[in-house]
C-alpha cells in the first residue's frame, strides 16, 4: 500500500498530451499529470522521459483499492534518486 508523500520507483509505459503513464510494480499503475511535471510550462510531456525509462515520482494521491496512484515529479530529482530538489540545492550552498 502506498500513501501520500511516498517516493516510488516506476517505469514509463506511455504518454498522452495530458501526462505520463507509469507502472510502479506488478499491481500499481500511475499518472503524472502535465501540471505535476514541472513548475515551468510543459509543451510536450515526451521531453521529460522515454518509454521504459526508470524514474522516481512522489505520490500525491493513492487509491489502494483500484491500485492507481496520482504522482508528481515537479519537486524531486526524478531521474536520479527521487530526493527533494530543494534539499540538494541547500547542500550545494552549504558546501560553498
List each model region and its residues.
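Single-stranded RNA-binding regions, centering on S1/OB-family and related RNA-binding modules
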Residues: 1-96
